[in-house]
């Protein structure tokens, strides 16, 4: 009888020891929340690059330092490091930089736990199309977040003037292909492929996705805020 009681007590103590750690791990991953995530993409018919504009309504669930250190600022994934014209479009952004995996954003001031703020930026993304004869195809997945939930996300792909694309998913309104998601869990993605059979120019295969220079390569990006 004593052995049974001792075994039961040891089991309860083990559960009690593990439970706080499990609860803490689950809670610690949710240090931010994204209320709204909007992405607008427009291909350039001359060189095949993508003009991308991203807008966030973001909430800090913990105090968020302004600078991008281990827990400051934010970082958002990009497809590869060959980008140009990276531009901050909102006043709260103090600095914006990139490497092959992320855009890193520093803010002009800290944000307190519970504070909601908005920011946006844009860039031109290169080496994104593939060629199959006269067909031009894009596959694009906006940065996702393994440690942050997203309330609402909209990806809008704008066909260039005079060109009509076929999207792999979502709804099409005129020349806009719209893909939406709500209540996105950790790590959930919103990929979209768009194919053009009537591209008006001859794009150079040298600048296609298949020929991305090794110095810009990013075979996998795991997006999260810092």
Labelled PLM ranges:
Residues 1-5:
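Positively charged n-region of N-terminal signal peptides that target proteins for export
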Residues 9-21:
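Bacterial N-terminal signal peptides
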Residues 23-226:
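Lumenal/extracellular ectodomains and adaptor appendage modules
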């Amino acid at each position: 009888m004593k052995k049974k009681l001792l075994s039961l007590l040891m089991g309860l103590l083990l559960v009690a020891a593990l439970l706080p750690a499990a609860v803490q791990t689950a809670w610690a991953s949710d240090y931010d929340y994204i209320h709204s995530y909007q992405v607008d993409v427009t291909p350039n018919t001359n060189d095949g690059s993508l003009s991308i504009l991203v807008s966030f309504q973001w909430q800090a669930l913990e105090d968020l330092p302004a600078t991008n250190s281990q827990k400051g600022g934010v970082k958002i994934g990009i497809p590869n490091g060959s980008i140009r014209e990276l531009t901050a479009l909102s006043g709260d952004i103090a600095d914006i930089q990139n490497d092959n995996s992320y855009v890193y954003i520093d803010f002009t001031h800290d944000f307190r736990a519970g504070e909601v703020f908005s920011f946006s930026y844009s860039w031109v993304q290169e080496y994104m199309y593939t060629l199959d004869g006269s067909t031009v195809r894009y596959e694009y997945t906006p940065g996702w977040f393994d440690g942050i939930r997203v309330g609402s996300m909209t990806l809008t792909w704008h066909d260039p003037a005079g060109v009509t694309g076929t999207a792999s998913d979502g709804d099409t309104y005129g020349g806009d292909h719209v893909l939406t998601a709500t209540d996105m869990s950790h790590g959930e993605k919103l990929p979209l492929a768009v194919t053009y059979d009537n591209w008006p120019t001859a794009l150079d295969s040298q600048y296609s996705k298949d020929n991305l220079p090794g110095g810009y390569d990013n075979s996998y990006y795991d997006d999260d805020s810092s």
